Design a protein with these regions (language model features):
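Core of compact, soluble alpha-helical bundle domains
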Residues: 1-138
């Protein structure tokens, strides 16, 4: 007999309304952040919608992001933006604070925070100018 899977993180969190609140909390922090705000367009609403769709899909809320925007391709979609280690860390800090602020139960908060920690470094696409070029010969 096969085991019936339990509820998804999406369901445990409270569905789309919970992810919309999370995204609103995150973008409120971005709005006031001197490092990250310049990387975003003046109108934050489309980005909020897209992030909400992405998170909902990733955590088990159906194919809403893919249905609207195609495959997520995170690295490709973020390639135009200079994401330094400092910017990535700030993004992770703001997202983690937004997650914790929601008061999710541990079975929701833990995987969300683990995802942020795991995914954030993969989006770094620009090193600071003071980093030695490791491709240069001796």
């Amino acid at each position: 007999m096969s085991e019936v899977p339990g509820p998804s993180v999406y369901e445990l969190a409270g569905g789309m309304p919970a992810f919309e609140r999370l995204v609103d909390a995150f973008y409120a922090r971005v709005e006031d952040d001197e490092l990250l705000r310049p990387m975003y367009p003046d109108d934050l609403e489309p980005g909020k919608t897209h992030l909400g769709w992405f998170l909902a899909q990733y955590w088990g809320g159906g194919q809403i992001y893919s249905d609207q925007r195609g495959h997520p391709r995170l690295r490709m979609r973020h390639a135009p933006f200079p994401i330094t280690p400092q910017a990535a860390l700030r993004w992770a800090e703001l997202m983690a604070a937004s997650i914790v602020e929601q008061g999710f139960p541990p079975e929701v908060e833990r995987p969300l925070l683990e995802y942020v920690a795991r995914a954030t470094p993969t989006l770094i696409n620009q090193l600071p100018d003071d980093v030695t070029d490791l491709t240069a010969g001796p």
